[in-house]
């Protein structure tokens, strides 16, 4: 009944992906895959169309530029002012410096982080 293979296609757009979007894309893509000859997937497989997720990684400068205005989590190679992880709104990114507005206890603060200092960055969910 189940298949051993999964063809996973990640889709995204600026306004975000809905469940309806993934269903429509699945209905468009599936028949197109069946028309390819020779069949690149001769064994049974499951087609999975999904979005990268709410807390997707931001691995490139381009993905960080696209995330300006979003709430993010950034881990650093070395601490800045004794802090190694920042979570807040990405206010700006010019390719070299990330500017993040974050909450330190009850006060808003802004930190400028060199892009080279970023070990990991991802979108985050604001609670």
From Swiss-Prot:
The keyword Cytoplasm applies. InterPro entries: Ribosome_maturation_RimP, RimP_C, RimP_C_sf, RimP_N, RimP_N_sf. Keywords: Cytoplasm, Ribosome biogenesis. It comes from the Bacteria. It holds the Pfam family RimP_N. It is found in: Cytoplasm. GO terms for cellular component: cytosol. GO terms for biological process: ribosomal small subunit assembly; translation. Its main location: cytoplasm. The keyword Cytoplasm applies. Required for maturation of 30S ribosomal subunits. Belongs to the RimP family. This is Ribosome maturation factor RimP. It comes from Streptococcus equi subsp. zooepidemicus (strain MGCS10565).
């Amino acid at each position: 009944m189940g298949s051993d293979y999964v063809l996973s296609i990640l889709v995204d757009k600026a306004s975000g992906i809905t469940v309806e979007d993934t269903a429509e894309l699945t209905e468009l893509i599936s028949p197109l895959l069946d028309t390819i000859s020779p069949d690149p997937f001769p064994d049974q497989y499951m087609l999975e169309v999904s979005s990268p997720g709410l807390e997707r990684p931001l691995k490139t400068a381009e993905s960080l530029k696209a995330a300006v205005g979003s709430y993010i989590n950034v881990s650093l190679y070395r601490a800045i002012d004794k802090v190694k992880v920042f979570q807040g709104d990405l206010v700006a990114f010019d390719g070299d410096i990330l500017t993040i507005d974050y909450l330190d206890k009850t006060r808003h603060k802004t930190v400028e982080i060199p892009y080279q200092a970023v070990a990991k960055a991802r979108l985050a969910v604001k609670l």
